[in-house]
Amino acid sequence: MAIVAVGTEIVQCARIAQMIQQHGEQFLERVFTAAEIDHCAQRPDATGHFSRRWAAKQAVFKALRCHRRGVSWTDIEIATHPSEGPTIELHGIAADLAEEAEIDAIHLSLGGCRTQAIAYVVLCD
């Protein structure tokens, strides 16, 4: 297994909080899947959870080099499995691009504090 690409993103949590406050459900439904919204909304620090997922999606966009290639935000889903922690599931065009690039594994690391969220993604063949 070799590293094909990496992507990283850092975001101010206040920026995501502002987007949620200004655009509400429209923003959430454009960027996050129903499962992601449900997961984050149930957490005491919902803004932090949404921010980390937003950062992860941006990191995937960078690693796949798929900006302006028709990939929607919801084509990249940050799923949470109790035994594994957060993982990336690709759908639609994002999944097609990963298959075309022969990506067999996607590794994700999320972090953050009260004010910032960060994600690091490694794509492997």
Swiss-Prot record:
One of its GO terms (molecular function) is magnesium ion binding. Keywords: Cytoplasm, Fatty acid biosynthesis, Fatty acid metabolism, Lipid biosynthesis, Lipid metabolism, Magnesium, Metal-binding, Transferase. The keyword Transport does not apply. Its main location: cytoplasm. Mg(2+) binds at residues 9, 58. Gene3D superfamilies: 4'-phosphopantetheinyl transferase domain (3.90.470.20). It comes from the Bacteria. SUPFAM superfamilies: 4'-phosphopantetheinyl transferase. Pfam families: ACPS. Its EC number is 2.7.8.7. Its cofactor is Mg(2+). The keyword Oxidoreductase does not apply. InterPro entries: 4-PPantetheinyl_Trfase_dom, 4-PPantetheinyl_Trfase_dom_sf, ACPS, Ppantetheine-prot_Trfase_dom. Belongs to the P-Pant transferase superfamily. AcpS family. This is Holo-[acyl-carrier-protein] synthase. The lineage of its organism: Bacteria, Pseudomonadati, Planctomycetota, Planctomycetia, Pirellulales. The gene is acpS.
